[in-house]
Amino acid sequence: MNVPLRLNLLLILFSLSFSAYTIYDGSKLIPISYAPNEDYDATEIVSTSAISQEMLSYYSWFASYGYCEDVDIPLFCCKDFINFFTEKWTIIIESSTTEFFDFNFVLWRSDEYKKYIFAFPGTRHDIIELLNEAVNIKLVNYNDEDNGIKVVNYFYKVTKEIRDLLFTSEVLKDFDEHPGYQFVFTGHSLGASVAADILYDAINRNIISPSEHNPALITFGMPRTGNEEWVVDFNTKVKNVLRVVRDGDIVASLPYSLINNPYTHLGGLILVNKELTSMYYCPKDIGEDYPDKVCVRTKSLDIKYHSYYFNPDTKFSSRCY
């Protein structure tokens, strides 16, 4: 077995033995009611001051929409998705392939809700291909600048491929014609990291001007995406980060932070319990080294904890419900 891969697997097993789930006094309990998320009032500004299960469930639909383009998924699995989106949202741009990766993305606009939503699904590769890619993961300089800001090469490679496909002159013109709209970026798994990278890149290229409530990032099962310097700089530009993780989701613990590759998580953790009955907002700006009585996630090799969020509303693995 490849040595880096063996080390990664040993680290997974080690963490499974020593992890525990507790909550700390600063966390905020958010009950899960399973109210139909199509009834959610999407005019609400996405922010960390107004977190609800209905809001997160609503945006999880967008994060999983891209899976509908998988040729192996029967059409009926996506019928409700399609009906849900076309009634309220206009597709501005949609892409299903890149040179490097079998990856798609969608940009919507709603004039009723005054929002743009950028959505990125996870990988459609099988687990063996993912493990092969994981062996070669490392941190690289963002934008080839030697300023200490580093991002994971695997996610950044996808980002660089799709950013010019996404931010076309027609799309930028559409932005200019709809001032004051909130930009919401969302994604699941790999797509969560790409959503963060694309958002960060758009700000640095002056495509989006950050403000108190704009833009916002909502992710589901997001892996670690950059180093601490990247996270700190990200936080100065994006004030509303909602990083949703289901307890037991092993992907949210990857890549493992090693001495020569100090991967760091964004803050804004919203920890959903394994039973999908409640969740806690853990207000911290960076990483997962909480003080006493911390929000600590358990880890499991059961992929369902990564594939299923807000069941029955969204099933990222089967995409049917």
Where are these regions (language model features)?
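Classical eukaryotic N-terminal signal peptides for Sec-dependent ER targeting/secretion
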Residues: 1-11
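N-terminal module-boundary/linker segments of secreted carbohydrate-active enzymes
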Residues: 24-47
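Beta-sandwich/jellyroll recognition modules and their flexible linkers
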Residues: 54, 63, 67, 72, ...
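A conserved cap/lid and substrate-binding interface adjacent to the catalytic center
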Residues: 82-186, 205-214, 236-239, 321
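Serine-dependent carboxylesterase/thioesterase catalytic core
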Residues: 167-260
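Lipolytic serine-hydrolase domain surface
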Residues: 227-321
